[in-house]
């Protein structure tokens, strides 16, 4: 086991604080409408220019192991806030730094860390309650535009995100992809889309666009491989008699079966398109079941004791239209029973709540969106790749912020909500004594910090701005972009309640952990051994 280095009390806390400050000072320059960018070196490719707190925090590793621990504690604040609320990471970092700074001053002056921690917790509970009381419900597209614009620092992005949210509703999924052009555009996909295209190009109905469009088709859904035409011949005969079209979704269609379908299509006997089933393994079964419920059909599977040769037309799904492209299939207006679709949506929502894996959650959200609201794709365009990546991060933040706003509502932005919570905190402080009171005072001081930082990033004196907002009526804050004092709700400067609440809770949690630290243990770096001397030349 490697030897360890240990630091105690004041020395340990100071080392942690240096790390906290190095990370927080790097992150906080990005706060507010006049916040600057940070350039991150990349091992491969061009450097990344970002304005996103958590992305910067994740890149920071310090050489000194003790300082690095302090930095990692605050990094945890940023990433936890990002996981829960998706935005507000810089605010959380600024709050944590302020609480740690004030707390360490008081501990150095003789305060008891454990009692300070109790005071901090009581104060945060009061602040969170106050933030919830201030919260207003999101009303309509305009509020969403405000939230997205503030989060991304760009009105165009705000409008785009609001359009996307309006089209796909809360259960829909909005994905962000890189565009081939310099334009940033929004594409709405109606109905259920999955990433599998036609098995054979001979199946297309529109040769110019290279896509197959089937109006009012039957849909055969199976998890089997179809190799011989005998398997589906009885079914095909019934469909030809009715003069209908057919979409086959199967594990694969190959050999003689595929050849027969293509020949019949070319002769005009039967218009049929075959696509492979989406997903893999258990996820494929679930997705096929989703398609079956959406179209009112049944998954023909041996597990259910169903045989392809005995399939009746009543077991097939129906849809108003199916569009099959080279790599995508879109089912529009499935004929499924609305109550069954609703039940399926509820079941997926429950799975989303219970899953612990981020990957599974993302896939479940996609399935939910396809069943419920549809899918919107924002194609991000920019002149250079560096700018595109930066823009993509900002759009992702804006999306997370709008979802958080729809969930829990909005509060005045620009650090105003924290300042407006101070009077409620003052009432609590009057009831506390000793170090508990000091703990609550630490939180009170920290609440001013986001606004002070926004003002300083705009090149103004933070303390003057903070005092002016404190003296103003509730809801009046500082518009740093236009350098004026306004009613934040009216000016459209708002933050999601969830983001504001999460930022203060996570910051306090990390600060409390760090302030109650008495010893720090790190691994001693091994000294590099000198290489052996080269052997003398032999003659």
UniProtKB/Swiss-Prot annotation:
Forms a cylinder of 14 subunits composed of two heptameric rings stacked back-to-back. Interacts with the co-chaperonin GroES. InterPro entries: Chaperonin_Cpn60_CS, Cpn60/GroEL, Cpn60/GroEL/TCP-1, GroEL-like_apical_dom_sf, GROEL-like_equatorial_sf, TCP-1-like_intermed_sf. This is Chaperonin GroEL. It is found in: Cytoplasm. Together with its co-chaperonin GroES, plays an essential role in assisting protein folding. The GroEL-GroES system forms a nano-cage that allows encapsulation of the non-native substrate proteins and provides a physical environment optimized to promote and accelerate protein folding. Gene3D superfamilies: GroEL, GroEL-like equatorial domain, TCP-1-like chaperonin intermediate domain. GO terms for cellular component: cytoplasm. ATP binds at residues 30-33, 87-91, 414, 479-481, 495. One of its GO terms (molecular function) is isomerase activity.
């Amino acid at each position: 086991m490697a030897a360890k280095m240990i630091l105690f009390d004041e020395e340990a806390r100071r080392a942690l604080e240096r790390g906290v400050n190095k990370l927080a000072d790097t992150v906080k320059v990005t706060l507010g409408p006049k916040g600057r960018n940070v350039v991150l070196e990349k091992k491969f490719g061009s450097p990344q220019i970002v304005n996103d707190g958590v992305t910067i925090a994740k890149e920071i590793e310090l050489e000194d192991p003790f300082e690095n621990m302090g930095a990692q504690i605050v990094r945890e604040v940023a990433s936890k806030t990002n996981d829960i609320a998706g935005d507000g990471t810089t605010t959380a970092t600024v709050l944590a730094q302020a609480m740690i700074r004030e707390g360490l001053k008081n501990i150095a002056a003789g305060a008891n860390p454990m009692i300070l921690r109790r005071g901090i917790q009581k104060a945060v509970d009061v602040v969170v309650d106050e933030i919830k009381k201030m919260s207003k419900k999101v009303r309509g597209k305009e509020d969403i535009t405000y939230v997205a614009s503030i989060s991304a620092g760009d009105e165009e992005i705000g409008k785009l995100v609001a359009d996307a949210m309006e089209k796909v509703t809360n259960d829909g999924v909005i994905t962000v992809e890189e565009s081939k052009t310099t334009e940033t555009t929004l594409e709405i996909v109606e109905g259920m889309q999955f990433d599998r295209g036609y098995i054979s190009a001979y199946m297309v109905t529109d040769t110019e666009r290279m896509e197959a469009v089937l109006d009012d088709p039957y849909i055969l859904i199976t998890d089997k491989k179809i190799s011989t035409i005998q398997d589906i011949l009885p079914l095909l005969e019934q469909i030809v008699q009715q003069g209908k079209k057919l979409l086959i979704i199967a594990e694969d269609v190959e050999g003689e079966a595929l050849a027969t379908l293509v020949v019949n299509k070319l002769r005009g006997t039967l218009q049929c398109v075959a696509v492979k089933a989406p997903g893999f393994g258990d996820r494929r079964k679930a997705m096929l079941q989703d398609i079956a419920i959406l179209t009112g059909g049944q998954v023909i599977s041996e597990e259910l004791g169903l045989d392809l040769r005995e399939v009746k037309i009543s077991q097939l799904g129906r849809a108003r239209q199916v569009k099959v492209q080279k790599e995508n299939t879109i089912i529009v207006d499935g004929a499924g029973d609305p109550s069954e679709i609703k039940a399926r949506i509820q079941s997926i929502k429950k799975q989303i709540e219970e899953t612990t894996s981020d990957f599974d959650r993302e896939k479940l959200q996609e399935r939910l969106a396809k069943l419920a609201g549809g899918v919107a794709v924002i194609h991000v365009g920019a002149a250079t790749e560096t700018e595109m990546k930066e823009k993509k991060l900002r759009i992702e933040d804006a999306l997370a912020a709008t979802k958080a706003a729809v969930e829990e509502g909005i509060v005045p932005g620009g650090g105003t909500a924290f300042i407006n919570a101070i009077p409620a905190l003052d009432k609590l402080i009057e009831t506390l004594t000793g170090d508990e009171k000091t703990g609550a005072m630490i939180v009170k001081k920290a609440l001013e910090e986001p606004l002070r930082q926004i003002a300083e990033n705009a090149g103004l004196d933070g303390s003057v701005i903070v005092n002016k907002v404190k003296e103003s009526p509730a809801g009046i804050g500082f518009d740093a972009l236009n350098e004026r004092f306004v009613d934040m709700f009216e000016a459209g400067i708002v933050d999601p309640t969830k983001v504001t609440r999460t930022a203060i809770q996570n910051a306090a949690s990390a600060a409390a952990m760090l302030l109650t630290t008495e010893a720090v243990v790190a691994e001693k770096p091994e000294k590099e051994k000198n290489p052996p001397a080269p052997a003398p030349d032999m003659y």
